[in-house]
Structure formats: C-alpha cells, structure tokens
Amino acid sequence: MSTARPCAGLRAAVAAGMGLSDGPASSGRGCRLLRPPEPAPALPGARLLRLPESEPVEAASPERSGWTEALRAAVAELRAGAVVAVPTDTLYGLACSASSSAALSCVYRLKGRSEAKPLAVCLGRVADVYRYCQVRVPRELLEDLFPGPVTLVMERSEELNKDLNPFTRLVGIRIPDHAFMLDLAQMFGGPLALTSANLSSQASSLSVEEFQDLWPHLSLVIDGGPIGDSQSPECRLGSTVVDLSVPGKFGIIRPGCALENTTSILQQKYGLLPSQGSCS
C-alpha cells in the first residue's frame, strides 16, 4: 500500500462536523472553463488548476499543454497519497488512490463520512473492471453503460485494497463519461476511490466554489467549470447506482440521474429482472 500524506490542515472541528452525499446529475463530457491552467492560491492548502474550455485536440496547442499539466499534477498528488478534487460527468468528486489506506482514511475524516458507508472505485476502461470485480454480466452490457453516469455494484476481487470498504464483499464501479477523468484514471493506472466533494449531509457540488470549505484540506483542485444547472435539483442526483451482483437480476440502490435509460437497457436489451425491493 502506498504511503499517504496527512490531510493538509485537518482540524478536529472539521473531522467532527462534516458529512457526505453522492451527488448531482449532468451531461457527459461537457465541463467548461474559461482559462488555461494556472495556480490560484485563494485558500491555503489546495493548488487550483483550471482546465481548458474544451477537450484539446491539437497536440501542440496551449490547451493540450494545460490539459497535460493538470493530468500530471493530479497523478503526482494521487501517487503521493493525497486527496484531489475532480470534475466528473455528474458532480465534483474527491479522489484518492484506492490502494492507499491512509488516503482512504483522510477522505472519510475530511468529509465527516461514516466509515460504514462505501466509497466507489473509478476506473478508466471497461477492461479494468474484470481485474477488480467478479463480472457476471455480458461485456456488452458494461460497454452500453460505461462510460456514463452510472455506478455498477459487483462482487469485488482480491486485487482491491482490503481496507477499502472492508465491511462488504461488493464494490461500486464508476467510469465517468468525462474526458479528463478518463484520461486521469488511465494515466494513474490503478483504482481510484471516488466520492462526492462535499461535507456529509450537505448538498453535492456542481462547481468548485460550492466546496471551498474543503480546499484547505486538499492538495489539488481541478476546476472543470460548472456541471449542469445549479438551480435544478435534478442536477444533484448523482449517478444511478445498480446492484449487478446477483446473476440475471438487478437492483436499483439509488435512482440517480440516469434511471430510465439504465433500467431500459438492463430489462429490454439484456432481459435482467428487477430484484425484490428494487425501486425500478
């Protein structure tokens, strides 16, 4: 397991008074920000890097340079055991190496999250799911839903850190439909633990400004611009969480932002049956 830095500036009051939620819904790759990456030390603790307005295409462009800078900075912090704030296809999240037990503990402390609540695992490719999970559905099903605003819960493999959600044999997998997160997960090369960027019991975040109270306790904040409409409650629903651990069935753990499309694919295309008690 990797060695983690202590959470920057963690205070006892923060550890005592925070809580969590896993949040909003929005469109896929559309993180928008107006300026190229630059450090902005508005608060002590976190370095802020702003992504280009759109995913860079030209290899030699300033946008590509800024995109690469942000990726390298995030990977370096994650490999050092730090906690990084990142944009996804649904909301802003907190990411750390799932292989670093100290970093996992740091995430729980700074959010004030109960350690009885699981963290999701973010991966960069469908092929990676087979390394970290016991997959009992067709690969085509995974490819229909990933990347996208869903969390698929399956039985975990022995490859995952035993300190990650030690109270359950299951793990939720995310492959966000967000260009930066896909690049980050692939460049990092291992499982990332992912949860929403907010204090426990508070609303999930659609912009970096909405979780500024966490900045002093983070090493890096990646600003991808606003995600969705902050005035719309639907934009804070978070990913749709589906239990696929029982062969031939599915269970909706959280309806989230993609319920209708997800259940349609599972039932109509793959013939899965909703499990008893599922809210589908």
Curated annotation (Swiss-Prot):
Residue stretch of the organelle transit peptide: 1-56
Quote the InterPro entries the UniProt record gives: DHBP_synth_RibB-like_a/b_dom (IPR017945), Sua5-like_dom (IPR006070), TC-AMP_synthase_SUA5 (IPR050156)
As one GO molecular function, the record gives: L-threonylcarbamoyladenylate synthase
> Does Cell membrane appear among the keywords?
yes
* Stretches assigned to the YrdC-like domain: 68-258
Gene Ontology biological-process entries: negative regulation of transport; tRNA threonylcarbamoyladenosine modification
* Matches recorded under PROSITE patterns: YRDC (PS51163)
| Gene induction | By ischemia/reperfusion and endotoxemia.
What are the alphabetically sorted keywords of the record? Cell membrane, Cytoplasm, Membrane, Mitochondrion, Phosphoprotein, Transferase, Transit peptide
Q: Can you name a GO cellular component term?
A: mitochondrion
Where is the protein found, in the record's own terms?
Answer: Cytoplasm; Mitochondrion; Cell membrane
Q: Where are the transmembrane segments?
A: none
At the top of the EC hierarchy, this enzyme's class is transferase
Q: What is this enzyme's EC? A: 2.7.7.87
Query: Where in the body, by tissue, does this protein show up?
Result: Widely expressed. Expressed at higher level in testis, secretory, and endocrine organs.
Keyword Metal-binding applies: no
One Pfam entry name: Sua5_yciO_yrdC
Annotated catalysed reactions: L-threonine + hydrogencarbonate + ATP = L-threonylcarbamoyladenylate + diphosphate + H2O
Residues with Phosphoserine modification: 61
The secretion signal range is none
Entry-linked PANTHER family: SUA5, THREONYLCARBAMOYL-AMP SYNTHASE
Function description: Cytoplasmic and mitochondrial threonylcarbamoyl-AMP synthase required for the formation of a threonylcarbamoyl group on adenosine at position 37 (t(6)A37) in tRNAs that read codons beginning with adenine. Catalyzes the conversion of L-threonine, HCO(3)(-)/CO(2) and ATP to give threonylcarbamoyl-AMP (TC-AMP) as the acyladenylate intermediate, with the release of diphosphate. Participates in t(6)A37 formation in cytoplasmic and mitochondrial tRNAs. May regulate the activity of some transporters.
Q: What family is this protein classified in?
A: Belongs to the SUA5 family.
Domain remark text: The mitochondrial targeting sequence (MTS) is weak and only mediates import of a small fraction of YRDC in mitochondria.
Its quaternary organisation is: Interacts with RSC1A1.
Name of the molecule in the record: Threonylcarbamoyl-AMP synthase
Source species, please? Mus musculus
Q: What is the lineage of its organism?
A: Eukaryota, Metazoa, Chordata, Craniata, Vertebrata
